[in-house]
Amino acid sequence: IQYLLGNLDESYLKRLREFGGLQSYPSRTKDPDAPDFSTGSVGLGAAAPLFAAATRRYVDSHFGERPHSRFIALIGDAELDEGNVWEAVADPATAELGNVMWVVDFNRQSLDRVIPGIRIVQWRAQFEAAGWHVIEVKYGKKLQAKFAEPFGEELEAWIDAMANEQYQSLFGFSGQELRTRFLDGAPAEVGKSVAELTDEALYELVTDLGGHNLDSLRDAFAVCDSVTDRPSVVFAYTIKGWGLPMAGNPRNHSALLTGDQIDNFRNEL
């Protein structure tokens, strides 16, 4: 992205993780396009903007207010397993920071497991207990529209009841295999709700998560902008590797595309 914006020389694109090349995590001392915060140690990218906002509040109250600004962090769901994140959330100094927004990339995959569904319930409760404003962007506009049709309530209930491991496994299938696995054990009403869909349309529906839908994200961000008395966190449901051949594959962490896959992806773009 930085290269496309003209902020990074093309030569760096071929030197990822090399000595003198781009780091695997943002670094203010090593990257040529200095980021706002260095990360590397998991959890720092979440906590640093939060305490920066607290510092900004102190500066404004003691030395005069500056133009309004926002402090935004994009973090992974497995990053919420880090203890320093919750220390920052619970710190009294970070309360009532209405100019803070965290966006959690909730793809349910970490390096070595699929995140259990119960975790989102626990995390939401922890944020709310600390006084945060919480939004879940779970479904895209296609699924939301489908839920409003006949048997849509049953369809939504069926998807909501699925374990993360079960739902995650669907992304690796297409055609009749996807339909069979998706409807396995489902009430008859769920089958009726998708009966008229082609296999391709069913795949697009099942994978229509809110984190990939710009309209759903815009709506959530607008709500966060209106909440000015506390920090906000947005859980954006996504598919790891979305749009790529390894999308949703449990072994896709740091996976590389083959030459043929890159050529196909380039043609699709």
Where are these regions (language model features)?
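Cofactor-binding active-site loop characterized by glycine-rich and histidine/acidic residues
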Residues: 1-95, 116
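Short amphipathic alpha-helical segments, especially helix-boundary/capping motifs
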Residues: 23-29, 63-66, 98-102, 193-198, ...
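Structural motif
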Residues: 72-75, 101-103, 233-237
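A glycine-rich helix N-cap at a beta->alpha junction
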Residues: 8-18, 94-107, 125-133
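Long, well-ordered, tryptophan-enriched scaffold segments
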Residues: 106-269
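A general structural motif
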Residues: 68, 97-99, 229-231
